[in-house]
């Protein structure tokens, strides 16, 4: 592996991509440390500490997890882009025009990316406006009595909203730069470094509050989860494919045997990111409703969220989170892998699965195999995401868990890490170097 890493640095083009990616990630972490103008940073920190100890502490920790501590600086981070991506992906099933764009290849994908950008900016404006409005009237963080925004004039509030929206656009631009000119998926890598940046502080918190024995147990559990995740992520069902010989001009092509790899976890970490992003929406709605009513009384929605969606050990919370992961796993697999299209491509180039007729029977067979491996893959994702949260919640005696050591964070970090390593490996293999993974 060391020799492969040295080879990647010796290759000029690959070295440029790796250094470019690292440079953007460093720039992202530096920009993430800058608070929004007009915001009392110390008061925000104090309010965050009070809020994470309350009933919605899990959600505040979750938002900070994905944004790399953006909530501490009163910024929006990557959340608008994630939400926009979810909506655009859902629209490909609902709106025929989006389905046509998805089938148009690179041109259609570029158009959908453009729609995602526009929607992300609109959501960033909406989210920034909501955060500033809630922070101005004291309804952003539960139990917070501090003055977060000192100057509450219209001009000052508009400037804060514009700066927060510009920050979200900058984060989106950084992610797309990494995807286009660097290595790996840009937005996933930004989430990755956001989680990694919080590990030392959260580890120290566990060590100080729970002692060395609990800290060692948590590290051991995280190590076991990492080994299990890597094992499952590398698992795949290989469907043999043969290509018939055919004459093109004066040359004979085909006659080779290969395989079609179908991963056990075909969807990757996307379902976990989508489900974790959606789980905080009920709390945002609750805050808006509570702010609109002046904090007087509690609606049925407020009571439902406070009772069932605030405690990660609650059975309703676990079932909803687990169900969202399974839903997004099936949904994302159906969007990214189309058995009919794959069967048509194989038939076009003279490929066939031994024992299966080309065309419709091949598509039905691929659909059957995919459905059989997607179910255990979705259950695996849900179990890894839910069980460590429950165990750590019980071990803390009811305190809010440290999310960077939970299943959601481990899944995201391992999934993004493996995907990035595989991209580097493919670049090395194209240049006749030995890869990382053997």
UniProtKB/Swiss-Prot annotation:
Q: Which residues form the signal peptide?
A: none
Q: Which UniProt keywords apply?
A: Cell membrane, Membrane, Protein transport, Translocation, Transmembrane, Transmembrane helix, Transport
UniProt keyword Amino-acid biosynthesis present: no
**PROSITE patterns noted in UniProt:** SECY_1 (PS00755), SECY_2 (PS00756)
Is Cell membrane set as a keyword in this record?
yes
**Any idea where this protein resides?**
Cell membrane
* Family matches, as Pfam families: SecY
Membrane-spanning segments:
18-38, 76-96, 121-141, 154-174, 177-197, 212-232, 269-289, 315-335, 375-395, 398-418
- Main localization is membrane
GO BP annotations, alphabetical order: intracellular protein transmembrane transport; protein targeting; protein transport by the Sec complex
- State a GO cellular component annotated for this protein: plasma membrane
Bilayer topology annotation: Multi-pass membrane protein
Q: Which PANTHER family did the record assign?
A: SECY/SEC61-ALPHA FAMILY MEMBER
Question: What's this chain's function?
Answer: The central subunit of the protein translocation channel SecYEG. Consists of two halves formed by TMs 1-5 and 6-10. These two domains form a lateral gate at the front which open onto the bilayer between TMs 2 and 7, and are clamped together by SecE at the back. The channel is closed by both a pore ring composed of hydrophobic SecY resides and a short helix (helix 2A) on the extracellular side of the membrane which forms a plug. The plug probably moves laterally to allow the channel to open. The ring and the pore may move independently.
Share what the entry says about its subunit structure, partners included: Component of the Sec protein translocase complex. Heterotrimer consisting of SecY, SecE and SecG subunits. The heterotrimers can form oligomers, although 1 heterotrimer is thought to be able to translocate proteins. Interacts with the ribosome. Interacts with SecDF, and other proteins may be involved. Interacts with SecA.
Family listed? Belongs to the SecY/SEC61-alpha family.
List the protein's name. Protein translocase subunit SecY
Which organism's genome codes for this protein? Mycobacterium leprae (strain TN)
